[in-house]
């Protein structure tokens, strides 16, 4: 068409943000206060991606009766608002995809000023029209109030009462105009949605703590009770087919779709409770031998109707500060050396409620005796054997310091065994009411090492350089998903999803293996015509035309969980100057490059493609246009990276004039440099969950920001 449209540049901008902080404090010997206020006005890199936030914090402390009674009051108030270009979210990431695939020879608008849309191509929208013909706003308000009263009736006993109330309320609305693609292509004739959500948490915690020191012995004992009540409610409605765009989402009832039963509305309400009794004992002998033992006894309303709504979670740890032993007094190596070990159990209640009971739900409408009615049907089997998920952890470690405390650090080894993982098991119906039953019989283990080293390599009168190195590694394994009663039909299940047009699972979870295994077809080359050559499950090479893409030919192509992480933080101070450089990296993992998978493929002639789509695959031939988009090993890459996360340079002025006690000027670069062999935009992708390591093509890219600021102390 003769145009030269850079669609990426059109939807992006340089975001300019400003942040303001104000803190003041004061008081007397008996009463003091601190007030913090923060205002943030943030522009995203996409058009119509704006956020405004105000937050205030206040804390007041007061003591009386010779410091026997101490009262603390805390208040947090937060108000956040952000624009929305997608229903129920913030930014429409689908517009990013459309900018990537859009033909640069097409215009943004027609000659008459209307948006140019090529509706003859499937899933091909004008990204600028998607952004500017949608309008939404999300507003969030939070209020948190807490009060703490501590009373010391006798010298060694402290009674404490904590009360808190936390409420988060969110309201939002969204509208797509009659010029949006949803009308142009789908005929919705204007679309609106509104919704609200409220989260409320109330907490009361009562404790009594006893502290006694005698003849080198120190004993601390704590006993307590806690009760937490949580409420969550939400309502949502949508409508379309509006007479005008003037109302936006503010008059949602005038749309015709809801009246015709074609739109959606629903509401939701959930109450949960958590009650607990707990105790802890700490023992210390001359700061040499340390012991801690604790027990929590908790019940959760999510387990109502089961035989085990209560759980017991013990923990114990021991420590030996070797450097305080008499035989270590004359040694010159360690300034401090402490050996420690611990074992503990923590519990996690299910996120869903009523899991122990049979549930019924409303099905579809059907005609009965001349009337449309909805039938009740089973939606969940009861399972009175459900219980808390438990994490059993063993930890051994050492803390040390050498060279007159110039180098200190910690080294830890841990082993975690999670028992009672929830999983949905297929069961016969009848005799069961429903075809699946949820039970917690799975087991998963994690083991790893965590190291942190702090050092001061240089320390003179004017110059100080301090560094922190962190290292961690973790290996997990799914140990079991079955017991004598509940068994899986196979030793694996598929998870993850690669969206249309590929539409296939991306990961496999297998008993006895790591979580995060990437599972797909392995290619070893292309033929002279640019068609894939596969390696089947027998290890034989198969040409594209003869390959059946059978499930049994899929193989493990990598793992999306890094084997180890490394961090290196540095701070240099020279007179009034200071420089901080923070770096980190992840290593030993693979990434599915979704951008290359879709945009290096030449089978879709109506999409824009990456220039690399015309590179020779495996250095032999350009990929044949008959090879449609698919997920295979060619698009799985090593994800190792090293990032210079943050660089901050600052200068500190001493007292200026009569009123300014201190002044600091600084400049910061975030997400400064990334060193990687990965071909995608950013190797830092999601590494959590069951399908880690997928670089989705519809994702808000990480940004690089430059900040200039000042801190004034009066």
Summary of predicted features, one role per range:
Residues 1-3, 44-51, 55-142, 162-275, ...:
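Surface-exposed loop/interface segments of Gram-negative outer-membrane beta-barrel transport/assembly proteins
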Residues 11-12, 19-41, 45, 57-63, ...:
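Predominantly transmembrane beta-strands of Gram-negative outer membrane beta-barrel pores used
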Residues 22-26, 58-62, 147-151, 206-210, ...:
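Residues on the lipid-exposed face of transmembrane beta-strands in outer-membrane beta-barrel proteins
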Residues 26-30, 39, 62-66, 212-216, ...:
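A generic beta-sheet turn/junction motif
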Residues 37-41, 291-301, 343, 457:
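Transmembrane beta-strand segments that form the barrel wall of outer-membrane beta-barrel proteins
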Residues 51-63, 309-319, 663-674:
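Short secondary-structure subsegments characteristic of cysteine-rich extracellular domains
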Residues 563-589, 635-654:
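C-terminal substrate/ligand-recognition segments
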Residues 643-675:
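C-terminal structured "cap/appendage" subdomains that terminate the fold
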């Amino acid at each position: 068409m003769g145009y030269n449209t850079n669609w990426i540049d059109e939807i992006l901008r340089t975001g300019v943000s400003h942040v303001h902080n104000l803190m003041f404090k004061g008081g007397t010997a008996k009463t003091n206060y601190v007030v913090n206020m923060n205002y943030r006005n943030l522009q995203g890199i996409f058009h119509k991606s704006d956020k405004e936030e105000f937050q205030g914090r206040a804390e007041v402390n007061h003591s009386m009766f010779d410091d026997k009674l101490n009262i603390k009051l805390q208040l947090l108030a937060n108000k956040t608002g952000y624009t929305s270009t997608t229903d129920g979210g913030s930014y429409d990431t689908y517009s990013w995809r459309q900018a990537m695939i859009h033909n640069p020879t097409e215009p943004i608008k027609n000659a008459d000023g209307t948006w140019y849309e090529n509706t003859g191509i499937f899933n091909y929208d004008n990204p600028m029209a998607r952004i500017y013909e949608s309008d939404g706003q999300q507003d969030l308000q939070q209020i948190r109030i807490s009060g703490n009263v501590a009373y010391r009736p006798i010298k060694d006993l402290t009674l404490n009462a904590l009360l808190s109330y936390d409420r988060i309320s969110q309201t939002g609305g969204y509208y797509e105009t009659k010029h949006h693609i949803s009308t142009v292509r789908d005929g919705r004739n204007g679309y609106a949605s509104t919704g609200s959500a409220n989260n409320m948490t109330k907490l009361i915690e009562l404790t009594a703590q006893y502290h006694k020191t005698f003849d080198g012995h120190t004993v601390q004992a704590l006993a307590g009770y806690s009760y937490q009540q949580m409420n969550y409610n939400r309502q949502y409605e949508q409508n379309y087919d509006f007479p005008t765009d003037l109302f936006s989402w503010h008059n949602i009832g005038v749309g015709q779709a809801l009246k015709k039963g074609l739109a959606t509305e629903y509401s939701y309400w959930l109450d949960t409770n958590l009650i607990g009794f707990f105790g802890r004992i700490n023992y210390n002998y001359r700061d040499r031998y340390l012991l801690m033992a604790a027990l929590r006894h908790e019940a959760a309303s999510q387990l109502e109707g089961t035989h085990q709504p209560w759980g017991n979670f013990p923990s114990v740890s021991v420590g030996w500060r070797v450097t305080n032993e008499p035989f270590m007094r004359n040694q010159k190596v360690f300034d401090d050396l402490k050996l420690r070990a611990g074992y503990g159990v923590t519990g996690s209640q299910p996120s869903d409620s009523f899991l122990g009971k049979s549930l019924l739900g409303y099905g579809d409408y059907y005609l009965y005796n001349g009337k449309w009615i909805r039938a009740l049907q089973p939606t969940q089997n009861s399972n009175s054997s459900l219980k808390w998920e438990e994490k059993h952890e063993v930890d051994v470690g050492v803390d040390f310091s050498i060279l007159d405390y110039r180098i200190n650090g910690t080294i830890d080894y841990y082993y975690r065994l999670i028992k009672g993982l929830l999983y949905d098991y297929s069961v016969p119906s009848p005799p069961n009411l429903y075809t699946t039953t949820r039970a917690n019989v799975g087991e998963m283990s994690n083991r790893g090492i965590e190291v942190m080293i702090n050092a001061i390599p240089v320390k003179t009168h004017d110059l100080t350089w301090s560094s922190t190195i962190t290292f961690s590694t973790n290996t997990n394994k799914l140990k079991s998903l079955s017991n004598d009663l509940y068994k899986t039909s196979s030793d694996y299940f598929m998870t993850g999803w690669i969206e249309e047009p590929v539409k296939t699972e991306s990961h496999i979870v297998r008993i006895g293996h790591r979580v995060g295994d990437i599972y797909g077809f392995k290619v070893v080359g292309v033929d002279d015509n640019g068609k894939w050559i596969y390696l089947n499950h027998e290890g034989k090479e198969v040409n594209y035309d003869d390959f059946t893409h059978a499930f049994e030919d899929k193989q493990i192509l990598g793992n999306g969980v890094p084997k180890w992480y490394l961090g290196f933080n540095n701070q240099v101070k020279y007179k009034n100057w200071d420089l901080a450089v923070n770096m980190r990296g992840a290593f030993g993992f693979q990434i599915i490059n979704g951008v290359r998978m879709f945009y290096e493929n030449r089978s879709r002639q109506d999409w824009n493609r990456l220039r690399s789509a015309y590179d020779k695959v495996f250095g032999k031939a350009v990929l044949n246009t008959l090879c449609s988009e698919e997920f295979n090993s060619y698009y799985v890459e090593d994800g190792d990276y090293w990032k210079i996360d943050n660089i901050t340079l600052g200068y500190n002025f001493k007292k200026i004039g009569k009123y300014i006690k201190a002044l600091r000027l600084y400049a910061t670069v975030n997400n400064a440099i990334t060193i990687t062999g990965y071909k995608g935009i950013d190797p830092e992708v999601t590494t959590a969950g069951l399908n880690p390591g997928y670089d989705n093509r519809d994702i808000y890219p990480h940004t690089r920001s430059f900040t200039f600021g000042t801190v004034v102390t009066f």
